[in-house]
Amino acid sequence: MAGVLRSLRFWMIICVQVLSLVLAQDRDEFVYHDFSQADLHLDGMASIDDGRLHLTNNTTKSTGHAFWKIPMNFTTSPSSSLSFSTEFVFAIFPLLGDGQGMAFVVAPFMDIRYSGDAASYLGLFNRKNDNKTENHILAVELDTNSSPEAIEDSDNHVGIDINSIISEDSANASYFSGTEGKNISFRLASEKSILVWIDYNGTEKLLNVTVAPVPTPKPALPYLSSSIKPRKPLLSRFINISEIFNGTMFVGFSGSTGTVKSDQYILGWSFKKGGQAESLDLSKILDPPNRPPPPSSPPPPPPPPPTPPTSRSKDSKNIIIICVTVTSIAFLLMLGGFLYLYKKKKYAEVLEHWENEYSPQRYSFRNLYKAIRGFRENRLLGAGGFGKVYKGELPSGTQIAVKRVYHNAEQGMKQYAAEIASMGRLRHKNLVQLLGYCRRKGELLLVYDYMPNGSLDDYLFNKNKLKDLTWSQRVNIIKGVASALLYLHEEWEQVVLHRDIKASNILLDADLNGRLGDFGLARFHDRGENLQATRVVGTIGYMAPELTAMGVATTKTDIYAFGSFILEVVCGRRPVEPDRPPEQMHLLKWVATCGKRDTLMDVVDSKLGDFKAKEAKLLLKLGMLCSQSNPESRPSMRHIIQYLEGNATIPSISFDTAGFGIPNISNETITQMTATSSSANFSFEDVTILFGGR
């Protein structure tokens, strides 16, 4: 019997321990007004001193971390919420300068110590892993140092960091005063208690950060932090943390010291996942300690016995003082020169005398670098054969798209810049506006209006798109692009050949209007000018037969590509799709086949619900008319506009003359096309062809 009781007692103890462990794993909130018994994981300089969490001390180039030991479950599921809220009180004592700063951190693990230069990165990153998406770190920094590693120039700012020391958003430390109706600035490294509120709404995907000094003298009676929380947050940013967090995460703090030092204290902390954190009772929070003593140093040696001063000793002493002063000044000048050259090299641009005439359209590299947060991966909108495109925001609040391409000196950069300036003068509601450019070393940055709805290509072919375009929206986009091409071909001061018309180069603005973009292959020429044969460029399925045969781009080759574009939008498929059955592989041939069978409506995009059959038939016939193998049979853009608006009747077409193979061009046309290019020597090595979108 005694044995049975002992066995039962043993299993009861095991069950209690397991239950305690399970309950501990489910804890999603805590409050600390004192850290004496706090369940924290500490490393580096971090320690608990008299109930205060002491993150950093007077050690140089070191880090300190403190994390709550129990992980938080941030997996996305119907039963869990990604919302969280936290409050904490901190104080920073500057010892030499204001120190490097500290941060509230949500990280996938507690041990985030790095060797090397981590102290310059708030103890969160180092030079090798900064700006890596695999970091899975969200931090709110309280930065008291301006360093070359970060873009922010202020040594007293609050920032939201995602996987990098470069903040997604930042602002100088201040709080909104309801009585004065404005923001009031204060110092983070003030030796005084400062409150921080961080709230993330998982439904709205909105992160708010608010800061304010704790009132002095501190209330002796119970006094909740919520009563002094400013109405307006300092920072407010839309962030999808499900793309950052990696399931189980840890919450805590990170601090660091570089060559400048500071004591950083956390005096109270409240946290809750899935709701609002409990307000801290300020009457229970410990005051900041008295100013920490300066670093200890060995006692000075006893003074030597006094000797009567002599004129020689006085002269020697003056010489030493002068030498030390001159050496110090020289060192400071060298250091200043080094920092100046470092920043100058970092933001160095290429600027030649002939570019002065284009100066109103030049942007400084420094401003663009800040606008797109240092070419970070999370700012990347797309990439292709002509460079990468990043999203940015100018200080005025204007959103921009910046294309980063590498230019070839042999192309004649002066001519290229002149064409950029010409493109900057193009003004049409259905063109993506080029705002300006910047040259730096071997790269060129082109600045455009930002189009919030991305490319038409994405709407037509991305299966993950939540919403398809309606029939009326597609028709409106086709009409908009046609209007833009009429402007380029006939209404501007020169003839502009786009040479790369396709769905991936049509961008959609906030109202889903189509705008023709990507002028990377565009060419300008005067009206009546004989056209030169050039390197053959374009995309398979959009290139007119005479372009590949003769190497001369004209308005008719643009119209051929526009015809392929019309078919692409109406049919919801690319001009060439190798995975389809042979007779359907080439869209133009498939439409021609269905036209001859009198089953033209079979090619209309099956994703469309309701559509107007009469309009669809007109657009399909217009696409085929633009795609005739003989360029003389293709309409001009002015006639195309008339057909689209119903002001003219589209002529009857033959479905047997779709543009494939060698074109049927008259001798007169061939003579005109080759008049100035008889010396051109073409081979397949001269052809630059793209397949599909980019």
UniProtKB/Swiss-Prot annotation:
Binding, ATP: 381-389, 403
Signal peptide as annotated in the record: 1-24
Cytoplasmic-facing ranges: 340-694
CC annotations in GO: plasma membrane
Compartment(s) of residence: Cell membrane
GO MF term list: ATP binding; carbohydrate binding; protein serine kinase activity; transmembrane receptor protein serine/threonine kinase activity
Statement: the UniProt record of this protein carries the keyword Transmembrane: yes
InterPro entries in the cross-refs: ConA-like_dom_sf, Kinase-like_dom_sf, L-type_Lectin-RKs, Lectin_legB_Mn/Ca_BS, Legume_lectin_dom, Prot_kinase_dom, Protein_kinase_ATP_BS, Ser/Thr_kinase_AS
Enzyme Commission code: 2.7.11.1
UniProt region (Legume-lectin like), positions on chain: 27-272
Active site per the UniProt annotation: 500 (proton acceptor)
Biased composition (Pro residues): 289-309
SMART domains with a match to the protein in the record: S_TKc (SM00220)
Membrane topology of this protein: Single-pass type I membrane protein
Residue numbers spanned by region Disordered: 283-314
UniProt similarity note: In the C-terminal section; belongs to the protein kinase superfamily. Ser/Thr protein kinase family.
Protein name: Putative L-type lectin-domain containing receptor kinase II.2
This protein's encoding gene: LECRK22
